[in-house]
């Protein structure tokens, strides 16, 4: 009787393990959601509207900023968000010719290449999200990054307006992302310095996955919630 009971327990454990294995195979990060679901905030944004640029040095309010390419970059400071109904940024062109959309996973930074991917972590609650930097700013004292309204919601600081964050530049993910949206960096140093447009046709490799969809796929790879 005891041996029969043990056998039943072992059978249940085996079924549970097999079920867990099948679930993990059925739902890898890139197929947990359909491309249609991941593209719902920008379904027609299948070609990247901006261009790759580093940019020249520039001055704002008497302070000089020096955009630069980098292989490693971390920064800690305060983040704010933009794209509210009254600030007028929604739909406007960004610093690299993209269109700002408050519902997408994007951000503005003073010196990082455009576009690039960064991981932003809210120090107050440890929530993180990976964003595409496609604009310049913020230029208020003690602010190191401006995130979109959607990103502020994910990081849970929309209501308070600002929060302390850590920024981590993701060089490898950036390179893969640029390939996925078919955006090439300028080949010559002169072109990179002058920030001229890439000669790429800028069409996403998968016509069913929007630009924001590609950003969400990187988040899912890192097991970060993107609320598709």
From Swiss-Prot:
Species of the source: Rickettsia felis (strain ATCC VR-1525 / URRWXCal2)
Signal keyword on record: yes
The protein's name in its UniProt record: Endolytic peptidoglycan transglycosylase RlpA
Family named by the database record: Belongs to the RlpA family.
Keywords: Cell wall biogenesis/degradation, Lyase, Signal
Phylogenetic classification of the source organism: Bacteria, Pseudomonadati, Pseudomonadota, Alphaproteobacteria, Rickettsiales
Purpose: Lytic transglycosylase with a strong preference for naked glycan strands that lack stem peptides.
Gene: rlpA
UniProt GO BP: cell wall organization; peptidoglycan metabolic process
Signal sequence segment: 1-23
Coiled-coil ranges per UniProt: none
Pfam families, sorted: DPBB_1
E.C. numbers: 4.2.2.-
Enzyme class: lyase
